[in-house]
Amino acid sequence: LFFYPLDFTFVCPTEIIAFSDRAEEFHQLGCEVLGVSVDXQXTHLAWINTPRKEGGLGPLKIPLLADVTRNLSLDYGVLKEDEGIAYRGLFIIDGKGVLRQITVNDLPVGRXVDEALRLVQGXQYTD
């Protein structure tokens, strides 16, 4: 589960596309990848329908959730309340619903998909 600040921003598309492009690697590990922002479903759809060459996402292999109430962001502790957006949070939750890893980055700092895969593999290896 990863949170990102807003659709149509600078860092977000590179992260989301990277997670989408490697979704099969996560699936092979028994993982589902979900992206979350405070944007509405219509905004997600517009971003997905915008070609990558024009700053859009294009077709994705992962779902984007619309946290318009900001309850998910608040519950996971990533809501930047003064701006009403989420920090870049990554939560790795195992098949039993146990939270295994939390990483929260400041707004301008992106995440590496390789590191997320490594963390999933590490938690599975130690089980």
Swiss-Prot record:
Keyword tags: Antioxidant, Cytoplasm, Disulfide bond, Oxidoreductase, Peroxidase, Phosphoprotein, Redox-active center
Function summary: Thiol-specific peroxidase that catalyzes the reduction of hydrogen peroxide and organic hydroperoxides to water and alcohols, respectively. Plays a role in cell protection against oxidative stress by detoxifying peroxides and as sensor of hydrogen peroxide-mediated signaling events. Might participate in the signaling cascades of growth factors and tumor necrosis factor-alpha by regulating the intracellular concentrations of H(2)O(2).
Location of Phosphoserine modifications: S73
Active-site feature positions: C12 (cysteine sulfenic acid (-soh) intermediate)
EC number: 1.11.1.24
Note: The active site is a conserved redox-active cysteine residue, the peroxidatic cysteine (C(P)), which makes the nucleophilic attack on the peroxide substrate. The peroxide oxidizes the C(P)-SH to cysteine sulfenic acid (C(P)-SOH), which then reacts with another cysteine residue, the resolving cysteine (C(R)), to form a disulfide bridge. The disulfide is subsequently reduced by an appropriate electron donor to complete the catalytic cycle. In this typical 2-Cys peroxiredoxin, C(R) is provided by the other dimeric subunit to form an intersubunit disulfide.
Domain Thioredoxin: 1-125
Designated name of the protein: Peroxiredoxin-2
Class in the EC hierarchy, top level: oxidoreductase
Listed GO MF terms: thioredoxin peroxidase activity
Subunit-structure text: Homodimer; disulfide-linked, upon oxidation. 5 homodimers assemble to form a ring-like decamer. Interacts with TIPIN.
Post-translational modification remark: The enzyme can be inactivated by further oxidation of the cysteine sulfenic acid (C(P)-SOH) to sulphinic acid (C(P)-SO2H) instead of its condensation to a disulfide bond. It can be reactivated by forming a transient disulfide bond with sulfiredoxin SRXN1, which reduces the cysteine sulfinic acid in an ATP- and Mg-dependent manner. Acetylation increases resistance to transition to high molecular-mass complexes. Deacetylated by HDAC6 which decreases reducing activity.
Pfam families tied to this protein: AhpC-TSA (PF00578)
Origin: domain of life: Eukaryota
Predominant location: cytoplasm
GO cellular component terms given for this protein: cytosol
Catalyzed chemical reaction(s): a hydroperoxide + [thioredoxin]-dithiol = an alcohol + [thioredoxin]-disulfide + H2O
Subcellular location: Cytoplasm
UniProt similarity note: Belongs to the peroxiredoxin family. AhpC/Prx1 subfamily.
Upper taxonomic lineage: Eukaryota, Metazoa, Chordata, Craniata, Vertebrata
Gene3D superfamilies: Glutaredoxin
GO biological process, one term: removal of superoxide radicals
